[in-house]
């Protein structure tokens, strides 16, 4: 396995662990969301919205962790890439379309993580596509 894919796997595990922490925080205290993320319109944040956000974050976390474990599973790889695309779209729309988020560290951090992850996973696709060919050459 290429060194890049090993780094990507480590990155996915780290992002997954952080997301699990965010999940716990969303279930524990919904004020976390309007103090850190949705500072533009904090009155729209309630317990139900926080728990929904928590479940979405947990699902993304599990998918990313599974991809780190089985990075050669192309279907899982593409689904994982979509979790980052959806997160990026969500936070950009909350920031620029709906106005529920302000450009604070709480929003800029997930935007950066999603952007770097998308970039890394797109680069990783080239390594995934190249690997089976190099494995076949070694066998012959």
From Swiss-Prot:
Its main location: endoplasmic reticulum. Pfam families: Erg28. The chain crosses the membrane at residues 4-24, 52-72, 79-99, 105-125. InterPro entries: Erg28 (IPR005352). One of its GO terms (cellular component) is endoplasmic reticulum membrane. The keyword Transmembrane applies. It is a multi-pass membrane protein. Keywords: Endoplasmic reticulum, Lipid biosynthesis, Lipid metabolism, Membrane, Steroid biosynthesis, Steroid metabolism, Sterol biosynthesis, Sterol metabolism, Transmembrane, Transmembrane helix. It is found in: Endoplasmic reticulum membrane. GO terms for biological process: sterol biosynthetic process. PANTHER family: ERGOSTEROL BIOSYNTHETIC PROTEIN 28 HOMOLOG, ERGOSTEROL BIOSYNTHETIC PROTEIN 28-RELATED. This is Ergosterol biosynthetic protein 28 homolog. It comes from Mus musculus.
